[in-house]
Amino acid sequence: MSQDLSHVPESIRMVLIGPPGAGKGTQAPNLTERFCACHLATGDMLRSQVAKQTPLGIEAKKIMDDGKLVSDEIMINMIKDELTNNQDCKKGFILDGFPRTIPQAEKLDEMLAQQGRPLEKAVELKIDDELLVSRITGRLVHPASGRSYHKVFNPPKTEMKDDITGEDLVQRSDDNVEALKKRLTSYHKQTEPIVDFYKKTGIWAGVDASQPPKTVWSDILKCLGKN
């Protein structure tokens, strides 16, 4: 499928918004490759800290096990550190999983303004909750890279093995229905105001995430075009 991409910018500074299972883990690597940008998945950053049992990781695990969110200061500093020290972030970044609240969005804007790198776009992946439940309960993740698969919708070439490294895939422990419903309730309550925030600042764009991944990708590129 050829398409005119002349309207798509060469670099991007954006936020990817969407509930768990909306396809952020599928689309973010496409964006990273297309724009030579870094993918800052705050969930992956935190899980990495938890796995390494750093002081931050131990503190974060306690908070996450209670179904709560890690403090804004910790998250902002973690992102700032990546933007400053990660060479992959020089050409742009895709923030995934942050911000989740209006105060976070305001603090993020403030920090990015100080760096002279304000957000250009906030793309929301929109999808129905019931479809999400069926999608996410079959989700498989490659811990080292964050690549995600699905038992039904996007299976790996070899069962329970990562396509690229051949390493084992895991099913996240919080990917069961009850935990998911709790996460969705939290998502809607806390994250939907973010959409209104970015609509007001004029950088929001919405994409129907129930479509096939290739169609979603095409729609994301259209959103990123300089209007």
Curated annotation (Swiss-Prot):
Cellular component, GO annotation: cytosol; mitochondrial intermembrane space
Residue numbers spanned by region LID: 138-175
Residues where ATP binds: 21-26, 139, 148-149, 211
GO MF, one annotated term: ATP binding
Keyword DNA-binding listed: no
Keyword list, A-Z: ATP-binding, Cytoplasm, Kinase, Mitochondrion, Nucleotide-binding, Transferase
Annotated region (NMP), positions in chain: 41-70
Any GO BP: ADP biosynthetic process
EC number: 2.7.4.3
Binding site for AMP: 42, 47, 68-70, 97-100, 104, 172, 183
Pfam families reported for this sequence: ADK, ADK_lid
Reaction(s) catalysed by this chain's protein: AMP + ATP = 2 ADP
The keyword Electron transport belongs to this UniProt entry's keyword annotation: no
Subcellular location: Cytoplasm, Cytosol; Mitochondrion intermembrane space
Function: Catalyzes the reversible transfer of the terminal phosphate group between ATP and AMP. Plays an important role in cellular energy homeostasis and in adenine nucleotide metabolism. Adenylate kinase activity is critical for regulation of the phosphate utilization and the AMP de novo biosynthesis pathways.
HAMAP family: Adenylate_kinase_Adk, Adenylate_kinase_AK2
Oligomer and partners: Monomer.
Assigned protein family: Belongs to the adenylate kinase family. AK2 subfamily.
Domain remarks: Consists of three domains, a large central CORE domain and two small peripheral domains, NMPbind and LID, which undergo movements during catalysis. The LID domain closes over the site of phosphoryl transfer upon ATP binding. Assembling and dissambling the active center during each catalytic cycle provides an effective means to prevent ATP hydrolysis.
The protein's name: Adenylate kinase
Species for this entry: Kluyveromyces lactis (strain ATCC 8585 / CBS 2359 / DSM 70799 / NBRC 1267 / NRRL Y-1140 / WM37) (Yeast)
Organism classification: Eukaryota, Fungi, Dikarya, Ascomycota, Saccharomycotina
Gene: ADK1
